[in-house]
């Protein structure tokens, strides 16, 4: 039977968990006063995902630091994002430590984003496993294949908007690997790159549907409206740069064996110790999900 590998976008789940409870002023402090709401929420989310997705293998990928190779391409990349709140700062390391204590494998490489490591893993093992990627980031849709699906997070711990390659083609009218070209035209306000000013998602998608690639659009400029021609010619350099930024790399120097990621049964003692250390929400959640003897 083919393995089922679940790859978690750790930073996406951590931020999501933090802001879901911080908005109500719930920071769930440990006995020493350290806030833990994001880290405990992250672990609870992964535990719940395991019961839903039933993976045989599991990996968690993390961003490592504020700058990556994309900042060398464009210094405005993600420059518009605010710094994390002070209460969240100790929870980055906390989340990774909790994951390791539970037995999950953490991966992060300086200079690369979690998305890039996810990309490397998905491409490395797409012929060996069924793969589910859990994230809130639609950029990952470009990784869809017949064996890789994307589970986009929704409200709570158990709701997902699941994309397969077939669903993506039906909805977008392009292949998943063409999605980065759409992003290059429309830009990404969250990541801070503009694409072609005046070209939105609808037009960007229509261009790639009709001309298939950035080169295809540029070779057919005379067939576009005068306004579209002007916009693309004015921002052609930014268009190419945005395409570099939108593509997920397969070049990150990740060394990992699928066998290292095998999920093993949990032991009650692991969560009892976490409860003693103040992580009571995790312990309670684990007991509600798993029949410890």
Task: Enumerate the language-model features and the residues they cover.
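Non-catalytic nucleic-acid-binding/docking modules located in mid-to-C-terminal regions
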Residues: 2, 56, 147, 162-293
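Conserved RecA-like ASCE P-loop NTPase motor core of nucleic-acid helicases/translocases
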Residues: 131-137
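Noncatalytic, basic helical substrate-engagement surface that gates or grips nucleic-acid strands
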Residues: 2-131, 142-149, 154-158, 237-241, ...
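Acidic, divalent-metal-coordinating active-site segment for phosphoryl/phosphodiester hydrolysis
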Residues: 138-139, 202
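Single, functionally critical "micro-switch" positions that shape active/binding sites
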Residues: 8, 136, 199
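Short gly/pro/ser/thr-enriched loop/turn and capping motifs at secondary-structure boundaries
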Residues: 139-142, 157-159, 215, 225
